[in-house]
């Protein structure tokens, strides 16, 4: 297995999340920690995944929430922030984690971005071929609550209660 590039170390990722939590505290940080532990546990048993990379990807997938209380904007904010820091692999996860289907319309929240920002996000998403880390974090994001992992249906109800139910919810 080759360790992917473009991800911070665990120590760096923990520092980034701590700084983000100080800026915008909320249950999203506990969810991120649960996601990190779950992703690392799954990666430890997978022959092609690196446990440390999976941990940092899980820890930072929602890092865009550092900017404040937003809906789908956190995807773009995280992508831009992590790219600016020189972590394109982690930035990619911030972008892909909300889209098991590569279409902005399938998101579980409203878009609080400008039309130009949405177009940029759509283009960036379309240009990717998902890898095992993208899929791993999509999976763990779908089962991680702030208090721990749960069955996927419970998490989907949690998301639907907060963000609503749309035409893509069942397809996901």
Model-inferred region functions:
Residues 1-8:
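Non-catalytic interface/linker regions that flank or bridge core catalytic/transmembrane domains
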Residues 10-25:
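Generic N-terminal amphipathic, Lys/Arg-enriched alpha-helix
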Residues 166-172:
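Charged phosphate-binding loop/patch that engages nucleotide di/tri-phosphates or the phosphate backbone
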Residues 163:
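Active-site/ligand-binding-proximal alpha/beta "capping" segment
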Residues 38-42:
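Active-site hotspot residues in diverse enzymes, especially metal/ion-binding acidic/histidine motifs
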């Amino acid at each position: 297995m080759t360790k992917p590039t473009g991800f911070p170390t665990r120590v760096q990722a923990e520092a980034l999340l701590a700084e983000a939590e100080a800026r915008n505290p909320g249950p999203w940080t506990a969810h991120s920690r649960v996601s990190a532990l779950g992703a690392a546990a799954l990666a430890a048993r997978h022959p092609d995944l690196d446990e440390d990379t999976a941990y940092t990807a899980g820890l930072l997938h929602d890092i865009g929430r550092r900017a404040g209380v937003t809906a789908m904007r956190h995807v773009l904010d995280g992508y831009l922030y992590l790219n600016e820091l020189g972590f394109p692999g982690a930035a990619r996860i911030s972008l892909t984690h909300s889209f098991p289907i590569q279409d902005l319309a399938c998101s579980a929240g409203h878009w609080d971005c400008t039309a130009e920002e949405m177009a940029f996000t759509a283009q960036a998403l379309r240009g990717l071929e998902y890898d095992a880390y993208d899929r791993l974090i999509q999976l763990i994001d779908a089962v991680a609550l702030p208090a721990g992992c749960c069955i996927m249906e419970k998490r989907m109800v949690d998301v639907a209660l907060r963000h609503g139910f749309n035409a893509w919810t069942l397809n996901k």
